[in-house]
């Protein structure tokens, strides 16, 4: 299963000039241009009508933020193309899985990319090394159903296993009721192939094996965490 370790998961954090983050939507003209280009340059479903956007404005949380629009990609190439278009038009992107989070991570004034419909394959199962390689939209329970005949099980057992996708769980660093014994996602994921905001496609893995730009990103995030360590410790809930 592919996903980066936590210290490597953040890429370049620079905000491009003109990008509006949070709850502010772009102009109607910009939204229309985004929809036009997505329909022309991708094979995915492009949803910019009010009812569709309304469905994606919320998740299992109490938050509600209307997205710019929605792309349901049919292949990885659609995702890469959408990121390139959004970068060109300075529109934020927001990947979405099952929308089962209770903290609002999948809501925002952005182009929502819903990976749960088509990008949900189990690409490989290595029984000898006890690993699986999957697409981000695969639901946890579906993975475990494929693993069961091999006597294997993915132990990050979130309560929403029938809806939560592996990509969303990785981004959320999910845990589950057995995390004391098995750890959370960061302890059960070996690597990830991902696109950065500039369109680069990189293979992330452990810090020990990182090189080139992947190592630079890891060092940047590590330094950022160290810089704000005292503030993080002070504000992290004591449970």
Where is each model-derived feature located?
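N-terminal accessory segments
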Residues: 2-60, 85-93
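Generic non-transmembrane alpha-helix signal with a bias for helix starts/N-cap capping motifs
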Residues: 31-32, 79, 140, 188
């Amino acid at each position: 299963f592919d996903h980066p370790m936590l210290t490597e998961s953040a890429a370049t954090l620079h905000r491009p000039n003109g990008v509006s983050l949070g709850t502010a939507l772009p102009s109607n003209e910009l939204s229309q241009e985004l929809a036009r280009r997505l329909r022309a340059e991708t094979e995915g479903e492009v949803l910019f009508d009010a009812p569709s956007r309304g469905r994606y404005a919320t998740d299992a949380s109490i938050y509600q933020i209307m997205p710019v629009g929605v792309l349901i990609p049919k292949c990885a190439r659609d995702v890469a193309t959408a990121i390139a278009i959004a970068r060109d038009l300075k529109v934020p992107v927001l990947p979405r899985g099952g929308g089962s989070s209770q903290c609002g991570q999948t809501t925002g004034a952005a182009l929502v990319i819903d990976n749960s419909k088509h990008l949900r394959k189990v690409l490989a199962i290595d029984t000898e090394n006890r690993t699986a390689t999957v697409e981000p939209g695969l639901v946890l329970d579906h993975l475990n159903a494929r693993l069961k005949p091999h006597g294997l099980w993915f132990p990050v057992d979130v309560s929403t296993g029938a809806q939560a996708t592996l990509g969303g769980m990785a981004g959320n660093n999910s845990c589950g009721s057995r995390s004391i014994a098995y750890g959370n996602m960061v302890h059960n994921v070996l690597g990830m192939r991902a696109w950065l905001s500039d369109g680069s496609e990189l293979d992330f893995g452990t810090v020990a094996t990182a090189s080139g730009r992947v190592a630079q990103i890891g060092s940047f995030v590590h330094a950022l965490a160290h810089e704000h360590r005292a503030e993080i410790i002070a504000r992290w809930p004591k449970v």
